[in-house]
Amino acid sequence: MLPLVALVGRPNVGKSTIFNALTRTRDALVHDQPGVTRDRNYGVCRLDEQQPFIVVDTGGIAGDEEGLAGATARQARAAAGEADLVLFVVDGREGASSLDDEILAWLRKLARPTVLVINKIDGTDEETVRSEFARYGFSDVVALSAAHRQGIDELLDEVGARLPEEGAGELLDNDPARVRIAFVGRPNVGKSTLVNRLLGEERMIASEVPGTTRDSIAVDLERDGRQYRLIDTAGLRRRGKVEEAVEKFSAFKTLQAIEQCQVAVLMLDATEGVTDQDATILGAILDAGRALVVAINKWDGQSDYQRAQAEDLLSRKLGFVNWAEAVRISALHGSGMRELFQAIHRAHASATHEFSTSEVNQALEIAYETNPPPSIRGHVSKLRYVHPGGANPPTFIVHGTRLKVLPESYKRYLENFFRKRFKLVGTPVRFIFREGANPYEGKKNPLSDRQVARKRRLMRHVKGK
């Protein structure tokens, strides 16, 4: 396992900016508003190819043990507790604070190897800044400006000198066999609670306060001999209610997670039914062409009448995606977890199935013979052949003539026919229709000598009259 380095400090000292600089990504949300980061976010630093290590970004410790601030602090402490090296980040512009003193006292009790990182030294007198933090008694001090990428090399040298060859960090691998699952939905429907339930630990901060999760956090999981990557995302609200820049970034990260996943689990709240915002999120999943499982959370607390009402609303509002399986779960109590994973497996298998050209052509031939396209204003579309065009979602490219007049109802017939024939569940199916260009359009066949002579005779005959 790779060594693990944790970034720890009070809010808004630049931990996420350092994380992005070390990992050469923009995986961590960065904003000048305190408290943007809440959950632990892991990445890999490969700036030194000989000594890669895992970096964990943590939320700022604000000195409050209650509510979201307390949950964020517990996440930061958990990260520091499992780290091989702690980078204690402070703000060089603001100087040492009483909160920095409290964090330092806790780090000394933790007794982990620690390096003091003074960030935001651009525009300051570095010697003055260093002297202010000298009372902390660190022999290992790095002064840098993460926003301008100044001092990152010096930080790497300090980190590299103190890392063990083997560490506590587990690398998020890129194993193609690992199923990538994104949990998406409105705020406060239970996404983080569900991920924590599946992991068996409080890996994500779960709270009744809407908008607790602000970033997309990926965690690897092995269950029943299979590999997964679970992606917890921020709740998506109506665009008119997204006011803060941080929340706009969070929404972007959620949409990005949908694009990168293989299966999207759309979480609904059984107590609220299907809202317009749920339909909007579903639209983003369908636009991305991702496999879909609908998870109806908080099902255990509903009466028989409420469940019947919820079922009726589900069939009316989500009837256009009746190919997606709906699973009734309780993230809090753990009911429905096995059924959820079974639905995810079926959706993933359908979305990634590889088709042969012969089997899809046979299916098209049977569909065509069973129900030929109708005549539209005297024109009938002809479907000549089809071939696979990709997976996730399954895509079929149909070639033929007069396909522009092929009605939408017939396209839906083909989709339903292929779904039934190949037992495709939980995934969109796309058809691309292409008309072959007529190679003789605009060209005339050259006349033979016999045809030329005949044409001359006809012309003489016409002139003679």
From Swiss-Prot:
Per UniProt, subunit arrangement is: Associates with the 50S ribosomal subunit.
**Could you tell me which InterPro entries the record lists for this protein?**
AAA+_ATPase (IPR003593), G_ENGA (IPR031166), GTP-bd (IPR006073), GTPase_Der (IPR016484), KH_dom-like (IPR032859), KH_dom-like_a/b (IPR015946), P-loop_NTPase (IPR027417), Small_GTP-bd (IPR005225)
Which keywords fit this entry according to its UniProt record? GTP-binding, Nucleotide-binding, Repeat, Ribosome biogenesis
Species classification = Bacteria, Pseudomonadati, Pseudomonadota, Gammaproteobacteria, Lysobacterales
> Which BP terms in the Gene Ontology apply to this protein?
ribosome biogenesis
According to UniProt, the name of this protein is GTPase Der
Check the record and name the SMART domains matching this protein. AAA
Which GO molecular function terms does the record list? ATP hydrolysis activity; GTP binding; ribosome binding
Q: Which organism is it from?
A: Xanthomonas axonopodis pv. citri (strain 306)
Ranges for the KH-like domain?
353-437
What's one Pfam family the UniProt record gives for this protein? Answer: MMR_HSR1
**Domain called EngA-type G: residue spans:** 3-167, 179-352
